Amino acid sequence: MRSNTLLQGIFYGALAGAAWGLVFLAPELTRAFSPWQLTAGRYLAYGLFAAVLIAPRLRKLLPHLGRAEWRALVWLSLLGNVVYYVFLASAVQLGGMAMTSLVIGFLPVAVTIIGSRGHGALPLRKLAPSLALGLAGIACVAWQSLGSGTVGGGAGGFGDGVIGFFCALAALVSWTTYAVGNSRWLGRLQAISAHDWNLLIGVVTGLLSLFVAVPAFTIILQPHPQSEWWHFIGVSAGVAIFASLFGNACWNKASRLLPLTMIGQMILFETLFALLYGFLWEQRWPTLLEIAAMVLVTASVLLCVSAHRVDEGGGH
């Protein structure tokens, strides 16, 4: 793999992480609304925007979409968007941003381990130093979270924090499955670009979110003043545009430029940006442990890049 391709892939991976970090902040901005309502609002907006953007090319794309492609679009939309965000928003509101960022920070480890089994992937022993630094960085955040009590620092008490922790674990499993499946599907596609595939996932996600929206805005709806509704609409639209459309497009671009084992490391950028947004929201500087975590996570990504470059040089 050429160095220029690696740098482009890292750049798009960092942009995706910056955009996706916003999804951790959205539940804090809309605490008056449930995770189900936030998920429905975000993905209804995402589906609408995606439908408008894909409409001019839809007729040309339809002949290339068979039963397998539609089935993949449905399960990728469910796992990577609807199911993932219901659990993530629940985790943030119950357990706090720090705890949720910590658990989701294990994504690179999970994806990299799975990716190391693929054909042509680097063996796990060559990725061990990078993974060790990544785990050390996550451990720093864990120590900080446990020491400050943020694991139980949600709106409820310790009980809500435990529930939030398991919600974050469920989100981790959901998105790990999506990341691996989506990367492999992007590798198979010939006549459909990564951008169009992202928009198709958006359209399908919007349709699936209707099944969430009906009960979310009828059965469990509570009265809200008009100002809160406008705030909710603004946050939903903003997350749909920046995280779902822009972030996913950057991620799909990175997925085509980088091997699966390296894609797993790129998810670390989401953790870094989520922590950064959390500091800005809480109006404080990071602690020494948090700074150490950022340094370790960044070093983990750089070591992963180095491992792939060494493998490239040794193979030719």
Language model regions located:
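Specific transmembrane alpha-helical segments of multi-pass solute transporters/efflux pumps
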Residues: A19-F24, A55-I104, C140, A240-L258
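C-terminal-most transmembrane helix of multi-pass membrane proteins
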Residues: Y43, W143, L260, G264, ...
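Glycine-/small-residue-enriched transmembrane alpha-helix faces in small-molecule transporters
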Residues: M1-A40, G149-G187, L207, H316
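Hydrophobic transmembrane alpha-helices of multi-pass small-molecule transport proteins
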Residues: A50, I54, P123-G152, L289-H308
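Loop-to-transmembrane-helix transition segments
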Residues: Q8-A16, K60-F87, I163-A171, I220, ...
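Transmembrane alpha-helices of multi-pass small-molecule transport proteins
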Residues: A32-V83, P108-I114, V173-G181, N198-I219
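C-terminal transmembrane-helix exit sites in multi-pass transporters
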Residues: L53-R57, L107-A132, A142, L272-I291
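Helix-helix packing/entry segments at the starts of transmembrane helices
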Residues: F11, G17, G41, N81, ...
